Amino acid sequence: MQVSVENTSALERRMTIGVPAERIETEVNKRLQQTARKAKIPGFRPGKVPMSVIRQRYEDGARQEALGDLIQATFYEAVVEQKLNPAGAPAVEPKSFEKGKDLEYVATFEVFPEFTVAGFDSISVERLSADVADSDLDNMLEVLRKQNVRFEVTDRAAQNEDQLNIDFVGKVDGEVFAGGSATGTQLVLGSGRMIPGFEDGLVGAKAGEERVLNVTFPEDYQNLELAGKAAEFTVTVNTVSEPKLPELNEEFFKQFGIKETGIEGFRTEVRKNMERELRQAIKSKVKNQVMDGLLAANPIEVPKALLENEVNRLRVQAVQQFGGNIKPDQLPAELFEEQAKRRVELGLIVAEVVKQFDLKPDDARVREMIQEMASAYQEPEQVVAWYYKNEQQMNEVRSVVLEEQVVDTVLQKASVTDKSVSYEEAVKPVEAPKAD
């Protein structure tokens, strides 16, 4: 087998492969012999059909099959011989495949970038530390109460946090527009569900009252036909309901699976959950800084095939998350390219760190992570058992642990500053990092 390789770009390779005619004929004959053993042809007993008849009937098909298999096999042999690491399937262009002659074809493909991760000492990380104070716990209890609020009809004027049942008709330039009308809509004032000015315009309204609201759609409104336009909404208030927060009692505690331990037992469980959330938030923020630092210190070119695969995966994710009748390939690729590029770059860099430092998932950390996740459930022992019986889930946990070990490895070499902050600041979400 003859092989030559041409570098057509930083990552693209054009490999010409020649396969001797003798090897092709050997593969063709092997398939014809297999066919002869089972072929059923009138006038001949099974297995006794002359090879000349078999060849006449089946040679073309056997040759096509042999050529396809040989291209696949010899491509793999060639990349191993040339020590290449393809990052996707090749585009194959046959150059010569006449019967009795050598097969020659060209395979064009991308390879994974070869690089060494460096610049660890240029990475700066701010590592937060915080505690769950009693005041934080009290605030969380209020949040839980508000999440379980009930509304009772009242005859007083509407205030912020009241729930209104309304009918409305919206007009732009004096014309009713699509999606601008509804009946029996429940709206909590101050929730920010409606465009600016709409909810404020209903403060003070009573049941049975009609109000005309003059508002303007935001410039960045999702419907471009309405963005920045003035609108008039005629709103009828059907009912006004005031919020009633539940008492912190046994009935309320049971909603969270906590029984017969009273308010102190409930506070203890909520604190545990807050502490778990705190640990995860701090860990996540450190990880994001480490990943940003690795990207900044190690600019690499990524194979287009990997980028396309990641874009397609994100498209499918988006359809699954948001639903609708749209197909993944109907979503513009540009929407996902930055996120896909970041993910692919990080995947390659993290994999290289694992390789450079010979990292393996730590079994003790795997157990610890499973127990941590299981502790959020009412029957943690069953959750732990489920993980250990599910190899796919175990592999996912191992991957997360290995990524954490990469972060730890980087932290040992990076510049780390510790900072004490409040619980609220520590758990506050940060904006998703953007690709460069």
From Swiss-Prot:
GO function terms (MF aspect): peptidyl-prolyl cis-trans isomerase activity; protein folding chaperone; ribosome binding
Lineage, highest ranks first: Bacteria, Pseudomonadati, Pseudomonadota, Gammaproteobacteria, Pseudomonadales
Family label: Belongs to the FKBP-type PPIase family. Tig subfamily.
Protein's organism: Pseudomonas syringae pv. syringae (strain B728a)
Domain PPIase FKBP-type: 161-246
Role this protein plays: Involved in protein export. Acts as a chaperone by maintaining the newly synthesized protein in an open conformation. Functions as a peptidyl-prolyl cis-trans isomerase.
Keyword Disulfide bond: no
Chief location of this protein within or outside the cell: cytoplasm
Domain writeup: Consists of 3 domains; the N-terminus binds the ribosome, the middle domain has PPIase activity, while the C-terminus has intrinsic chaperone activity on its own.
GO biological process: 'de novo' cotranslational protein folding; cell division; chaperone-mediated protein folding; protein transport; protein unfolding
Alphabetically ordered keywords of this record: Cell cycle, Cell division, Chaperone, Cytoplasm, Isomerase, Rotamase
UniProt keyword Mitochondrion, yes or no: no
Signal peptide: none
CC terms in the record's Gene Ontology section: cytoplasm
Reaction(s) the record says it catalyses: [protein]-peptidylproline (omega=180) = [protein]-peptidylproline (omega=0)
Subcellular location: Cytoplasm
EC identifiers of the protein: 5.2.1.8
UniProt name for this protein: Trigger factor
Gene: tig
Superkingdom of the organism of origin: Bacteria
InterPro entries, sorted: PPIase_dom_sf (IPR046357), PPIase_FKBP_dom (IPR001179), Trig_fac (IPR005215), Trigger_fac_C (IPR008880), Trigger_fac_C_sf (IPR037041), Trigger_fac_ribosome-bd_bac (IPR008881), Trigger_fac_ribosome-bd_sf (IPR036611), Trigger_fact/SurA_dom_sf (IPR027304)
